[in-house]
Regions:
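C-terminal terminal segments
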Residues: 7-8, 64, 346-451
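Phosphate-binding glycine-rich loops and their immediate beta-loop-alpha structural context
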Residues: 150-266
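Solvent-exposed alpha-helices and their adjacent loops that cap or buttress functional pockets
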Residues: 63-65, 74-76, 94-100, 113-115, ...
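A structural signal for short hydrophobic beta-strand segments in well-ordered beta-sheet cores
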Residues: 119, 125-132, 293, 301-303, ...
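Short glycine/threonine-rich loop/turn motifs
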Residues: 202, 216, 222-352
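Residue-level signal for inorganic ion chemistry
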Residues: 25, 69, 102, 161, ...
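Phosphate-interaction motifs
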Residues: 2-186, 384, 389, 393
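Short beta-strand segments
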Residues: 106-108, 142, 166, 197-200, ...
Length: 451
């Protein structure tokens, strides 16, 4: 018997819309202060920039050649000229004499233009002769260069003092290159959120269990969500399995807090059974912002915050125990919360698009449904700009316990309820509906349609 009578309070949660739940999650997480740290450039990858970055120096810092060729004075025009020296990338041209009229210097891509040169003629527009003048080989220039031709001017890529990267930018490979270019040694970034994941229930066993006793299931949720946390850009903390007593569940929550979790995710224990303790515990130790969503799957999804010493706030998501419900609510609510605590702007929280359905879809009577679908761009042979994005609802039965229908899916199709569509019961094929593109490697593919 539990020491706490949690059911009456837990039963009192008002059902809210999926859109309202999303707004509450975003507003709550946006109000939580984010900590900033300075990381070496080598470890800043996949973090979010916390401050604007300005170029200390112009890039390039010198007039540089765009191509392999010859530095010339453009007023000399075509003709045969001696090659007086070479300007390779990395050469200090300040130590070379100015280029005199009617002479040229060999220059490589990225090499600095010497004083006296104002253009580059690419190798393809020249021909090496057998002539020698004062011990210098002679090249024939066949093109009349114009001033600054094939020259990168000082600051043409980045001007000194220019803001080259805004706070809120996710640092990926290209951003690492930019930061290295402007000489940033320590990168100011938001600390990556720490996300604790735990499963609850007496029926749950570790995935490596070879022979399951009757009534037991392998814990797919925890492994799934730990992977999803990493995909979303946070650091996962594996909290294991909390058995079905109120004390064990609360101990697991407190342990996650003590280990520095910014977000805690539990699965199971959020419905109305006599061993569903999550909502009651959260009401005692924190603030429950919602405990029931008018959506399918994921109705009992619970969102709360827990205050601790100072101004520390821990975000808590109680996800349903069915694997599909857990992963769907993760994509819809947990993933955006991770991105907010990472420091990403609102525009980066979800990738939304509109798609055309390819089959009839039965609507739920009262709840919006998030169906696992394969979304792709389809065009006719020879078409490049007139195709359309379609959603294939062929992932099998959409039961909340059937994780197999996530395999191969790359989007969640947002299907309105019958109540939303004034009593209609079926969405006909060819209807345009919103969809949410899933993260990770589930990219939108292109298919050319052949009859």
């Amino acid at each position: 018997m539990s020491n706490y009578d949690t059911k009456p309070a837990a039963a009192a949660f008002k059902m809210i819309s999926a859109d309202d739940a999303y707004r509450i999650v975003c507003a709550t997480c946006s109000s939580i202060a984010k900590s900033v740290q300075g990381l070496p450039l080598a470890t800043a990858h996949r973090h979010v920039l916390a401050e604007d970055i300005h170029a200390r120096d112009p890039v390039p810092a010198y007039r540089a050649s765009v191509k392999d060729g010859y530095a010339v004075n453009s007023s000399d025009g075509p003709g045969k000229y001696p090659i007086v020296y070479e300007c390779h990338a990395g050469v200090d041209v300040s130590k070379l004499p100015p280029l005199q009229r009617n002479t040229v210097a060999y220059i490589s891509t990225g090499g600095p233009l010497p004083e006296g040169a104002d253009a580059v003629v690419q190798v393809e527009d020249t021909c090496m002769t057998k002539d020698v003048v004062d011990g210098k080989r002679v090249v024939e220039i066949s093109k009349h260069a114009t001033p600054s031709e094939d020259v990168r001017e000082v600051g043409s890529d980045m001007a000194a003092g220019e803001c080259v990267m805004k706070a809120g930018t996710l640092i990926e490979a290209a951003e690492v290159a930019m930061l290295a270019t402007v000489g940033v040694v320590k990168v100011p970034v938001y600390r990556m959120p720490q996300v604790a994941v735990m499963s609850t229930g007496d029926e749950v066993e570790e995935p490596m269990t070879e022979v399951l006793p009757l009534g037991k299931v392998r814990d797919a949720n925890r492994a799934m969500l730990l992977a999803a946390v990493s995909e979303a850009g946070a650091s996962p903390i594996d909290m294991g399995i909390a058995r079905d007593t109120e004390e064990k569940v609360e101990q697991a929550i407190e342990s996650a807090i003590s280990r520095g979790a910014d977000i805690i995710i539990s699965t199971g224990g959020v419905s109305m059974g006599n061993r569903d303790f999550i909502k009651g515990i959260l009401q005692r130790i924190g603030t429950v912002h919602f405990g029931k969503i008018c959506m399918k799957p994921g109705k009992p999804c619970t969102f709360a915050t827990i205050k601790r010493e100072g101004d520390r706030s821990i975000v808590f998501f109680g996800l349903p125990g069915n694997p599909v419900s857990a992963l769907t609510t993760f994509h819809l609510y947990v993933s955006p919360s991770i991105k907010i605590l990472q420091g990403l702007p609102d525009s980066k929280l979800r990738i939304n698009c509109y798609v055309t359905t390819t089959s009839n879809i039965q609507m739920d009577a009262a709840r919006v449904e998030y169906r696992r679908v394969l979304v792709e761009y389809v065009s006719e042979p020879g078409e490049t700009a007139h195709g359309k994005i379609v959603a294939h609802d062929g992932m099998g039965a959409q039961a909340s316990s059937r994780i197999m229908n996530y395999h191969g899916a790359n989007a969640l199709l947002v299907v309105p309820s019958q109540a939303d569509r004034l009593g209609e019961t079926v969405i006909p094929a060819g209807t345009v509906l919103p969809a949410i593109i899933l993260g990770g490697k589930r990219i939108l593919r292109h298919t050319v349609k052949y009859e």
